[in-house]
Amino acid sequence: SPFTNVTIDMTCPDDLKTQIPTHNNEHLFKNLCDEELLAEAKRRGKGSLEAMTYGDFEPEMNRIVIAFYEVLTTGDKCGQPFTFPIPTVNLTEEFDWDTPAADAVFENTAKVGSSYFQNFIGSQYITNENGERVPNPKAYKPGAVRSMCCRLQLDLRELLKRGGGLFGSAEMTGSIGVVTINLARLGYLYKNNEEALYARLDELLELAKSTLEKKRKFVTEMFERGLYPYTKRYLPGFNNHFSTIGINGANEMIRNFSGNKEDITTEFGRKFALKMVEYLREKIRSFQEQTGNLYNLEATPAEGTTYRFAKEDKKRYADIIQAGFDKNIYYTNSTQLPANFGSDPFEALAMQDELQSSYTGGTVLHLYMKERISSAQACKQLVKSVVQNYKLPYITITPIFSVCHKHGYISGEHEYCPKCDEELLAEYKAKQSKGA
């Protein structure tokens, strides 16, 4: 299935509220005579159908959300959840937690965890020197972020610096390409030598910049020669696209660097990782100034890269510290906590909040649940507590479940289907009783 992302707002975004729905460059309801629709428009405070804007259609928005989530929660004919599209739900201070649409979202989240949640609540504040919670002037705003996949998020404020504002350019952005840096190898090669580690990191960053600049030039040339005809139908060029640099294996970097005395869950490890992410942000900012092109820092998913890095390193450095065992070796993604870290989501949040907030190109924190959350209400309260008390930008709730081809969805992790086992046991007992 194609990798697709759908961003969902429960209230109409500010940049669309006053725009009219159109068809053939005219108002959708132009010359339409329908007394029932006109009466509904008047109930919504409009004197005519042609006076209606997108801001007047929130009831319809919510009906679409409910229908969409009903399909996602049901899954396919086997009860298997759909991998795509990935819905991103924008949680703002105007978000109404007590609507049928919100209930549909959190019923799905409690059962299969389809949604990613963009935090526009806790991320909007900082604590000042007096310990008071005050608005953060540098915070992302709902109109200034676009989620392009399961974690790539683009800061559209950078586009404002190019002139012309966001309107018309928000849907014309993306990433020209991604280069991921293997931090675990750096930790191994430069054990207990931070200066040498950063010197080599600088070399790798320059190589990443050179690679991304060459790719931008190549892709632009191909585009201008007419070799991307479908893209050219909706995209005027790649001027608003970011060059993305990502990182992988921060936890293993710290373990190798410290001789396995520290990891990213310790105070030393957390500070070491945070210092590096801040350093990377500054380097990327300087690349943007040098090249005139947009750059960002992403906690890249690295679904395949994490294994490839680990396997290539194992060939070269037999004693390098890695996650996993035997043939199933890998590096912990970006600056995430190790996979075997405890099951307390709030402990994970406390450790990751500052790190997760440092990326400019997107990141996501998975809060793993051992099984289905008891109810939509309980799931709602969990998400609400997280986004109100933490500033990290992007989270997802991930309940563990199993799928049987015969019985569909089963809460929790099961190697064998308990319902199938019950049926087999019943058959066995029936045969035994007949034999007796």
Regions found by a protein language model. Give the residues of each.
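Conserved catalytic cores of very large enzyme subunits
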Residues: 1-239, 260, 266-436
